[in-house]
Regions:
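Conserved loop->alpha-helix
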Residues: 1-211
Length: 211
């Protein structure tokens, strides 16, 4: 589990295609890695397979490549990094699982007086997971939904976030990982049976309105 508070920005320094997927080597200023531990790389939970001084190696299988932008990463790509949350740590962002729900396209980037506004496309099937001032993870960064848009959301990014994550590099058309709030996903799942079912009273009401 993660919080969406990026610890540092790493850099892809090696990529190798394999039969199982893709192996990555990433430059990172961590000194106490453990092989097998989890790390969020642009919000995707991956496993440290090997590490050395200022680098670690990880891999993404085919299923992960299909659901993320990892297949597009190349040497020099900058990525947001966050190690897994300790039980004693502060939960400064929100609960992030590292499970990318979908890849979104940046619709617009506009500078306001004290922030940068970023508009993202949201698929119709996921629109109900977002509410104004709700939480969302974008490329692993915990953010607040500033406003709901037609088939999209608007985010407001402060200067600190722009400087300390890769989100300051975003331009219209860029593709980003989006993970909706896990609480919203569970609530929607619990309500789905009730939303699908229609009682006889519903049918009677519809008939009355039509006649």
């Amino acid at each position: 589990m993660f919080t969406g508070l990026v610890e540092q920005v790493g850099e892809i320094i090696g990529v190798r295609q394999t039969d199982a997927g893709r192996e990555l080597r990433i430059r990172a200023a961590y000194s106490d890695f453990l092989d097998g531990e989890s790390i969020a790389v642009n919000g995707a939970c991956l496993t440290v397979r090997e590490h050395g001084t200022n680098w670690f190696a990880t891999a993404a299988v085919t299923t992960t490549l299909e659901r993320t932008t990892i297949g597009e990463w190349k040497q020099g790509t900058r990525v947001n990094l966050e190690r897994a949350l300790r039980a004693s740590d502060r939960l400064g962002g929100h609960i992030v699982q590292g499970h990318v729900d979908f890849v979104s396209r940046v619709r617009a980037v506009d500078r306001a007086s004290d922030a940068v506004l970023i508009d993202l496309d949201i698929p119709a099937s996921s629109e109900s997971l977002f509410v104004p001032h709700g939480s969302v993870a974008v490329d692993g960064v915990s953010l607040t939904v500033n406003e709901l848009l037609p088939h999209g959301i608007q985010l407001s990014l402060i200067e600190y976030t722009l400087r300390h994550t890769t989100l300051g590099d975003l331009t219209p058309g860029a593709r980003v990982h989006v993970e909706a709030d896990v609480v919203a996903k569970h609530v929607r799942r619990l309500l789905e049976p009730f939303l699908r079912e229609r009682s006889p009273l519903d049918s009677l009401t519809d008939f009355s309105l039509e006649h």
